[in-house]
Amino acid sequence: MKNINIYIHTWKINNWREILNEQLTYIDDSGLGEIASIHICNGDTEKKTWFEMWKHSFDNDSYYLYLQNLGISWQGTKYEDLTTNWRKWVMGGVVENWKEYISHLDEYDAVGDCWKDVSYYRDWHRNKRKYKDSDLTYPQHFATQMWWTKSSHLSKLENPFEHQKYSVPEHGGERVIMEGWLTSQGENFKELRNDLSKEPAEAYINQHLKNIPK
């Protein structure tokens, strides 16, 4: 089996230590802690952590697990429980069941949960009037934004800081385009689980309620 590298994106706001400790416990309980190299990366944007993974992939033949402290900006809000449950559901797959995920990496470039195809904003956005004639798209991605991949795929991707150039003002921020960074090259991706009923959609449409310290 290839070496395993786990990159944990940790935005150090609110009670970040609680989530980090939770995720490290998942890793240890799964047995991954005994065999994987763990990289804890701090930053206010995921592309900083992705950049470190991307650089690492050029000189290492490895499997990579990407984790993030999902829900950190919802702590102390009415959506804290909703986003916490979502994070734990995701961890229950990619970490607790890690052996199944990596078993598919010989055949696939990336493995994750809750796959979403490319979609037109006009087909789902609440502001129908604004986007009714628009060709703006949301890229294909794993909605969980925690996934497994391998160095042979990562090294083919564009520098994540360069990839953000594809963002346009109509996206409302670069996060939309960045969610598709992992899947921006190739078509060989594997979804293992899909339960979008667990996705905290209500929180996502109320971004103004996030708890982000000034």
Could you tell me what each predicted segment is?
Residues M1-K214:
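ER/Golgi luminal nucleotide-sugar-dependent glycosyltransferases, focusing on the catalytic module
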